[in-house]
Amino acid sequence: MDMWDTPVLETERLLLRPFTEDDLPAVFAIFSDREVNRFLPWFPVRTMEEAESFFQERYAAAYRDRSAWKFAICLKRDDIPIGYVTLSGDDSHDLGYGLRRESWGMGIATEAGQAVIRQAGAGGLPYLTATHDRENPRSGRVMARLGMSYRYSYQEQWQPKNIPVIFRLYQLDLDGQRERTYRKYWDQSAVHFVEKEII
């Protein structure tokens, strides 16, 4: 099995697995909600056809190319996706997640993230990063609960929404090398700084 084949993972409450075309109604429900997608780098889908295109471009292609882990987050009791958690295969090893609103505040993103982190450690990844919009501190609290630490903030002109966004980068070192910081976003951004009150 290739390192970047999305595996199936289980936790106490959750089943993490690849999305399939049978999940398109759930894909639509997750990615059509404006509030769920408010801080994400895409516009909400408006039709089932857009949901299918979104699935093909962002999920099926990653499964085919083995370029990232892209999990559907499902409750074990019904195996219906209520969100997603991803880990990129590039050098950022970026962790991302999102949930339908009715599943917020239940610790599900943290539980799913912990499972992905365990799998990443077993696979030998040295570190993971994650970023969140400064206007979305809820996501930063998930990162902190996952054991990640804040490293720096940077500004990016976010596409396709074409808006300036301040992001905070968090990092988790899985190999014990805590002095290392993933610097790509810092180096690429003309506006970067450390928010002392977060450290």
Residue ranges and their predicted role:
Residues 1-38, 70-199:
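Acyl-donor (CoA/ACP) binding surface of acyl/acetyltransferases
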Residues 35-57:
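Conserved GNAT-fold acetyl-CoA-binding loop/helix
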Residues 58-72:
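A short helix-loop-beta-strand connector motif used in the catalytic cores of GNAT acetyltransferases and
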